[in-house]
């Protein structure tokens, strides 16, 4: 789902939002189904867009919080829904009124920024080591052991500047304390009291669960707090005694958390507990009465020690230079860097913390986007590619022979590609298209432009199944154009392989489709002008680079059927031009999608029998090919045997999984395509590329094991013909999170909406797969919460590249860009 700032600025439909809220109230908070989305999802998406321009930082924060709260709407009890809807209506009313007619006594934005320009920071009470500079070693600032110095270096903290840019991961708001007597269930609070007693023990009911219990008292009463530690290592007696010693009798403790009611009275839900002062007879402490930072720690470095160190380094903040140009700071209402660093560590209040965080998040995004754009600019300056005309006989013939008209979205993307190919700098464009949107035909226009210019093209796919699918489709088109095309995979026979190599090197073969086999040293093109990479995220950087090296700065077109939200695309592929095919060909029927449990299997089997009896075909998908007791995942191999012998003995059932030999895979797919088998049991090998219009049922077992985007890809294997299709998501999971995610699939067929919800519900790491996600190493920025800031930073970076592409007028920014860009990417090039 694409969302630009221009669109957002005019798309906050206040009456529609209020009407949705009113109807939800009138219908008893049932999470009503609208034309496209359920009420909760509609509100989640509405608040997921950037806040209206002119909103205060506080209102921006509340706007983002509402997005997160409505993401959980389906799980809320009626009373909780009622409370959320009421608070939302109040917030929207107040926000709209403040935007349309700001109160006279409100502080103007610029005045508010001016107020935090020089924050008052408490002076450290620790000995100073002379004049503190940014390059001063931390070992000379505060007294510390050699072991502590080593531990700090392990955290990447060697100098004062390192520490100033080591940001807190959270905050404890000791400024807003309540007494024990004032506790109210449902509120998040902080209490301060003295330890009466402390125990740590292993639960008698669960040997893997260990419980820390602390009884606190203040002048108004007593409370018992519990923290839980899961894992056998916490059951060790030595560890338990060590933890108890942290909370000796009379130690002053601050505890922060959600107040909940239990059978023993009020308590805090698994609270954050902070020892303030173990020896002082009073509760006076430099920590109480302010918002305290909580830093990522390592064993041997305490929170107290790190805070003292940060306080001692505060005087060096004045030495920081701000490389961000003043005109950018003014345009985007950003506070200066010195203020932001001071307030991020020891904020005076939440408003100033919000301003500080916004500035530093902007910096992270700005340096990343500027780095991407600079890299693209330098590549274009250094490389010269062939220029392909956007017109010609081949392109016209292909347009005429197509049995359908391109959608408006397809035509728009084709035009963007042909414009790129008509320039001397190499194209580097990513085409995103929803399932069935017609990416392949768009790619063919690019291929034909290269061929009619006298160059060769290569199309690389991640699997043999997908490569074969592309090859078959291209052959059907290229035969009509009298153009040869060949397929090269790991299964290609030696004789055929040699023939292909010879034809490539002489230029006789204009187009080669294949898998990783294309990057072998023996594959040599005479004149490679275009590389098309399908499902490009499946290939590593080195694999893509090897293929590009087979030509002289060839144009590159990447394609993916896995929609990526715009913020994620900017973060991963900021140096690419991104096109979206956000329209499906006419005539596609919505796929009827249902989440079912094991109890409903008889009805599912009956649906399959009915569809097969009408001549249709069925996919049954499993997440693994071996039985796994740990995850309780049904194996495709075992289930194939069970279905064949017990459930559908009269049907022909095929089997497809990743461990079959290539010939066996192709045989299974061919049998399914040619209707020799009515049902195919498969793992996710079937996920992309397989096109069987006669298939109308997709059954996905253990659906909770898949990401939403992957489920959407699998569902896209049906619904390709004129008959009604069905997708059945089978799960036995009792998890509310799993049920909520699968509910999104029932409600929407829009891949971009599903990708956006997947990102919100699972976060970018889970969305991409944490092992090779390629995500930049952000210290503060969140791709879910900070989408608005990312878009502003991209806009600022694009403006900078237009006005000063070599940064000659901004030398400080140029130096800082190299440091920050490399740090964000971990020294690696992503694309």
Swiss-Prot record:
Keyword ATP-binding: yes
Gene3D superfamilies, A to Z: Nucleic acid-binding proteins, P-loop containing nucleotide triphosphate hydrolases
GO biological process, one term: DNA recombination
Function summary: Plays a critical role in recombination and DNA repair. Helps process Holliday junction intermediates to mature products by catalyzing branch migration. Has replication fork regression activity, unwinds stalled or blocked replication forks to make a HJ that can be resolved. Has a DNA unwinding activity characteristic of a DNA helicase with 3'-5' polarity.
Annotated residues for binding of ATP: 433-440
SUPFAM superfamilies to which the protein is assigned, alphabetical: Nucleic acid-binding proteins, P-loop containing nucleoside triphosphate hydrolases
Transmembrane portions of the chain: none
Native species: Synechocystis sp. (strain ATCC 27184 / PCC 6803 / Kazusa)
Domain Helicase ATP-binding: start-end pairs: 420-581
Quaternary data: Monomer.
Domain of life: Bacteria
Primary enzyme class: isomerase
EC number(s) per entry: 5.6.2.4
Keyword Nucleotide-binding assigned: yes
Protein name as catalogued: ATP-dependent DNA helicase RecG
